[in-house]
């Protein structure tokens, strides 16, 4: 009898273990759930949801935007990668070959682009007015007096206090054109203390955060510090909270690209780039990042909405008959402007745009001071990009901060845009070619990040 009872108890134990094992297997989350379970529904401070953005971006906007960014006007960006870091001297330059940037030879850049960054309209290029300009490279010698005054006004405006970025002097001998298609943003191996210092300075000194508040994961402070941080963040005014989320979203977007274009194989035969799901999990898995990863991805969507709104606001500037995406190739220039306007009208049709009217809407004096603080903090972040030790990372960091800075400039210039003349130069609101190229390429990076999230969702579905 005792032996029979023992056998029965043993069998029941085996059944229980099998069932409990099955239950654990059924309850075990996939990596996709851990990364994306919280990345759905409505975004904080917005009336828009993640699913609407995914559908709009991935199927209506992304393909056309990529085609535009492959055109000559948008693929060449002039940048000075040799500016010294204004904050510290001990920069360890990345010696890896993937950190290097290959600048363009002079004959690779279309003449129309090389002429000057402000010469993008009929007036500025004098395509019809100036019969003496046989070569665009000599356009300075053929400018009319009226146009010279306009150029002077535009230069003053570009250097004015409305700028959100510390822009490069593109006339400097150290400034070179870079083909963005030949120098893509991807994993370079740049990491460690130097990379951490860049982001630490950005977050700790430029996001309105007191030193007494610790960022989650910044120094392994645990759950209590995380709760303290988010209690502090929620207590901020909407403008300062938005500023932090924009920087976090930009950081997230960059990390998505590094994970999506990772060096998987490197030998004498070939280099193979592709999706690294392990790298993505380390940056965004809710368990591995103590809940931070999904928050970062939601901030990426917030950044998308801000830049999308700026593009919808600036449509009148590009709709003016005088505006051209000038490269010197008349047929392509016309086609590219048509594609640009098609994209901007699509952007304008987005049903759930961010409402920027909540920004700086209080007391006028306080709002003015807050806006100035906002601008100066972001301008400082753009200067930090010159401290990045990896030249390719520096290139894309400078471009994306200038693009976001241009988006903010547009959002805070609504009245100036509304009062622009339908033709002729606009003295009150102006965009240089550098700003235009950075604006659309920066948004292209974010759009690509959102598209890549769908790819990672599929790749992580069966990963535990």
From Swiss-Prot:
<feature type="binding site">
    <location>
        <position position="186"/>
    </location>
    <ligand>
        <name>FAD</name>
    </ligand>
</feature>
<dbReference type="GO" id="GO:0050873">
    <property type="term" value="P:brown fat cell differentiation"/>
</dbReference>
<dbReference type="GO" id="GO:0016491">
    <property type="term" value="F:oxidoreductase activity"/>
</dbReference>
<dbReference type="GO" id="GO:0034976">
    <property type="term" value="P:response to endoplasmic reticulum stress"/>
</dbReference>
<feature type="binding site">
    <location>
        <position position="283"/>
    </location>
    <ligand>
        <name>FAD</name>
    </ligand>
</feature>
<keyword id="KW-0249">Electron transport</keyword>
<dbReference type="GO" id="GO:0015035">
    <property type="term" value="F:protein-disulfide reductase activity"/>
</dbReference>
<feature type="disulfide bond" description="Redox-active">
    <location>
        <begin position="390"/>
        <end position="393"/>
    </location>
</feature>
<keyword id="KW-0964">Secreted</keyword>
<keyword id="KW-1015">Disulfide bond</keyword>
<dbReference type="GO" id="GO:0006979">
    <property type="term" value="P:response to oxidative stress"/>
</dbReference>
<keyword id="KW-0966">Cell projection</keyword>
<keyword id="KW-0274">FAD</keyword>
<dbReference type="GO" id="GO:0005783">
    <property type="term" value="C:endoplasmic reticulum"/>
</dbReference>
<feature type="glycosylation site" description="N-linked (GlcNAc...) asparagine">
    <location>
        <position position="276"/>
    </location>
</feature>
<feature type="binding site">
    <location>
        <position position="188"/>
    </location>
    <ligand>
        <name>FAD</name>
    </ligand>
</feature>
<dbReference type="GO" id="GO:0051085">
    <property type="term" value="P:chaperone cofactor-dependent protein refolding"/>
</dbReference>
<dbReference type="GO" id="GO:0070059">
    <property type="term" value="P:intrinsic apoptotic signaling pathway in response to endoplasmic reticulum stress"/>
</dbReference>
<feature type="modified residue" description="Phosphoserine">
    <location>
        <position position="142"/>
    </location>
</feature>
<dbReference type="GO" id="GO:0005796">
    <property type="term" value="C:Golgi lumen"/>
</dbReference>
<dbReference type="InterPro" id="IPR007266">
    <property type="entry name" value="Ero1"/>
</dbReference>
<feature type="disulfide bond">
    <location>
        <begin position="37"/>
        <end position="46"/>
    </location>
</feature>
<dbReference type="InterPro" id="IPR037192">
    <property type="entry name" value="ERO1-like_sf"/>
</dbReference>
<keyword id="KW-0813">Transport</keyword>
<keyword id="KW-0560">Oxidoreductase</keyword>
<feature type="disulfide bond">
    <location>
        <begin position="207"/>
        <end position="237"/>
    </location>
</feature>
<keyword id="KW-0285">Flavoprotein</keyword>
<keyword id="KW-0597">Phosphoprotein</keyword>
<feature type="disulfide bond" description="Alternate">
    <location>
        <begin position="99"/>
        <end position="104"/>
    </location>
</feature>
<protein>
    <recommendedName>
        <fullName>ERO1-like protein alpha</fullName>
        <ecNumber>1.8.4.-</ecNumber>
    </recommendedName>
</protein>
<dbReference type="GO" id="GO:0030968">
    <property type="term" value="P:endoplasmic reticulum unfolded protein response"/>
</dbReference>
<feature type="modified residue" description="Phosphoserine">
    <location>
        <position position="106"/>
    </location>
</feature>
<feature type="binding site">
    <location>
        <position position="296"/>
    </location>
    <ligand>
        <name>FAD</name>
    </ligand>
</feature>
<keyword id="KW-0676">Redox-active center</keyword>
<feature type="modified residue" description="Phosphoserine">
    <location>
        <position position="144"/>
    </location>
</feature>
<dbReference type="Pfam" id="PF04137">
    <property type="entry name" value="ERO1"/>
</dbReference>
<comment type="similarity">
    <text>Belongs to the EROs family.</text>
</comment>
<feature type="binding site">
    <location>
        <position position="199"/>
    </location>
    <ligand>
        <name>FAD</name>
    </ligand>
</feature>
<comment type="subunit">
    <text>Predominantly monomer. May function both as a monomer and a homodimer. Interacts with PDILT. Interacts with ERP44; the interaction results in retention of ERO1A in the endoplasmic reticulum.</text>
</comment>
<dbReference type="GO" id="GO:0006457">
    <property type="term" value="P:protein folding"/>
</dbReference>
<dbReference type="GO" id="GO:0045454">
    <property type="term" value="P:cell redox homeostasis"/>
</dbReference>
<feature type="disulfide bond">
    <location>
        <begin position="85"/>
        <end position="387"/>
    </location>
</feature>
């Amino acid at each position: 009898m005792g032996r029979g009872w023992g056998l029965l108890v043993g069998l029941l134990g085996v059944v229980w273990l099998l069932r409990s094992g099955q239950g654990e297997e059924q309850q075990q989350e996939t990596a996709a759930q851990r990364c994306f379970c919280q990345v759905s529904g409505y975004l904080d401070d917005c009336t828009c949801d993640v699913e609407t953005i995914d559908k709009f971006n991935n199927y209506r906007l992304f393909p056309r935007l990529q085609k535009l960014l492959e055109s000559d006007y948008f693929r060449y960006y002039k940048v000075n990668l040799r500016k010294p870091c204004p904050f510290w001297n001990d920069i360890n330059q990345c010696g890896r070959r993937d950190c290097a940037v290959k600048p363009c030879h002079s004959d690779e850049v279309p003449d129309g682009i090389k002429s000057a960054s402000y010469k993008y309209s009929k007036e500025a290029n004098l395509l019809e007015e100036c019969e003496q300009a046989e070569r665009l490279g000599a356009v300075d010698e053929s400018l009319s007096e009226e146009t010279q005054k306009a150029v002077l006004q535009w230069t003053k405006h570009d250097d004015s206090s409305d700028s959100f970025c510390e822009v490069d002097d593109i006339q400097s001998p150290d400034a070179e054109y870079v083909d963005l298609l030949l120098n893509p943003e991807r994993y370079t191996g740049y990491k460690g203390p130097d990379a951490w210092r860049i982001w630490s300075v950005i977050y700790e000194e430029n996001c309105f955060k007191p030193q007494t508040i610790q960022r989650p994961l910044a120094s392994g402070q645990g759950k209590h510090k995380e709760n303290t941080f988010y209690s502090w963040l929620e207590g901020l005014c909407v403008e300062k909270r938005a500023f932090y989320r924009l920087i976090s979203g930009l950081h997230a977007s960059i990390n998505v690209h590094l994970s999506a274009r990772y060096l998987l194989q490197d030998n004498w035969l070939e280099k193979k780039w592709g999706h690294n799901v392990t790298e993505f999990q380390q940056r965004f898995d809710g368990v591995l990042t103590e809940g931070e990863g999904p928050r970062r991805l939601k901030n990426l969507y917030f950044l998308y909405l801000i830049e999308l709104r700026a593009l919808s606001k600036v449509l009148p500037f590009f709709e003016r008959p005088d505006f051209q995406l000038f490269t010197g190739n008349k047929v392509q220039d016309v086609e590219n402007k048509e594609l640009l306007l098609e994209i901007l009208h699509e952007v304008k049709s987005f049903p759930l745009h961010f409402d920027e009217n909540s920004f700086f809407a209080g007391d006028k004096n306080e709002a003015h001071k807050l806006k100035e603080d906002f601008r100066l903090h972001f301008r400082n972040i753009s200067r930090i990009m010159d401290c990045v030790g990896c030249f390719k990372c520096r290139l894309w960091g400078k471009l994306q901060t200038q693009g976001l800075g241009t988006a903010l400039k547009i959002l805070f210039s609504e009245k100036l845009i509304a009062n622009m003349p339908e033709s002729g130069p606009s003295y009150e609101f102006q965009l240089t070619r550098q700003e235009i190229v950075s604006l659309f390429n920066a948004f292209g990076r974010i759009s690509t990040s959102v598209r890549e999230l769908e790819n990672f969702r599929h790749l992580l579905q069966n990963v535990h």
